[in-house]
């Protein structure tokens, strides 16, 4: 998928407002799903165990190597016109909206009627809210879980960055094979979120312009306050806020700085919004061992892949055309 196609996908994503069938079809059509996805790994105890068990773990954005991952900003100043629109609703007698605001006032430690009356009759001081929303930035990154892939197993940038300078390996997943995605096929899957809510995989968009995540930050700020209170009476408000943030997780997760565009990344995004790490079970169709992987680690990779039931175990080499290629491994 080239950069122009990624931009077209992004333009569709940022203009979605619901998750009905028509919206999903538009997004699927724009994403141009590849036939295969690749996952680059260094050699470690964890990566070998996950290879052996056909597991891929989601990671939160605050643990990624790029400190600018989830390339967004929070603009509290833009809340002023939103605030004015809220005042307008109150002055026009929208009682349902007023009740929601009273619930929000309780969450923020303010007297509900005073809050609503102040909102109706005059300006508010946004300084405190600005400080709190700025702190939400790290909380947002902790809530965004994804697994990173690319299309090309010979991507030189990723062999350097994520496979320890050609000393690791790459797992290749055939998306056309029904046996690739294993979640939901075992007894242990009955209560697993990955089996009940199958994650979607989307292309990453690269840009020098950050995404405006102010709405999402405000929503997360409210939801965190509701969760801390653990009050069932506020459950409907929690769901109301959560639904209002539809597609915001995808928009924030799928934008990175332009300088990373050679990664040509795809991301599997976990649909639920909780700070709990989970995994999916996916069986690679092929594993390629790195060009500089030490002999004893080559044996460990081949052994783990064999236990996982992976038939094609290959090694990376440079062919006669001076390009990266792969061939069956010799141990």
Ranges and model annotations:
Residues 1-331:
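Partner-binding and oligomerization surfaces adjacent to conserved cores of proteins
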């Amino acid at each position: 998928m080239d950069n122009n196609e990624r931009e077209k996908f992004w333009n569709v994503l940022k203009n979605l407002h619901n998750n009905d069938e028509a919206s999903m079809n538009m997004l699927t059509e724009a994403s141009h799903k590849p036939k295969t996805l690749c996952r680059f790994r260094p050699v470690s105890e964890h990566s070998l165990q996950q290879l052996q068990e056909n597991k891929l773990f989601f990671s939160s954005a605050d643990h990624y190597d790029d400190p600018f991952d989830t390339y967004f900003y929070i603009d509290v100043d833009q809340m002023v016109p939103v605030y004015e629109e809220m005042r307008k609703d109150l002055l026009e007698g929208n009682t349902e909206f007023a009740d929601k605001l009273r619930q929000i006032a309780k969450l923020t430690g303010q007297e509900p009627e005073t809050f609503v009356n102040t909102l109706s009759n005059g300006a508010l001081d946004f300084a405190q809210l600005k400080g709190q929303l700025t702190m939400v930035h790290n909380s947002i990154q902790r809530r965004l879980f994804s697994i990173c892939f690319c299309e090309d197993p010979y991507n030189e940038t990723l062999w350097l960055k994520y496979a320890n300078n050609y000393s690791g390996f790459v797992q290749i997943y055939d998306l056309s094979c029904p046996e690739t995605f294993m979640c939901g096929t075992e007894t242990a899957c009955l209560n697993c979120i990955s089996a009940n809510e199958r994650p979607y995989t989307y292309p990453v968009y690269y840009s020098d312009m950050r995404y405006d995540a102010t709405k999402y930050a405000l929503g997360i700020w409210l939801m965190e306050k509701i969760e801390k209170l653990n009050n069932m009476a506020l459950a409907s408000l929690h769901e109301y806020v959560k639904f209002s943030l539809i597609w915001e997780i995808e928009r924030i997760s799928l934008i990175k700085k332009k300088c990373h565009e050679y990664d040509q990344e795809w991301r599997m995004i976990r649909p639920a919004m909780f700070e709990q790490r989970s995994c999916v079970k996916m069986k690679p169709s092929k594993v390629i061992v790195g060009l500089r992987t030490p002999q004893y680690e080559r044996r460990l990779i081949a052994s783990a892949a064999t236990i996982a039931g992976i038939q094609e175990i290959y090694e990376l080499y440079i062919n006669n055309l001076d390009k990266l290629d792969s061939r069956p491994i010799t141990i």
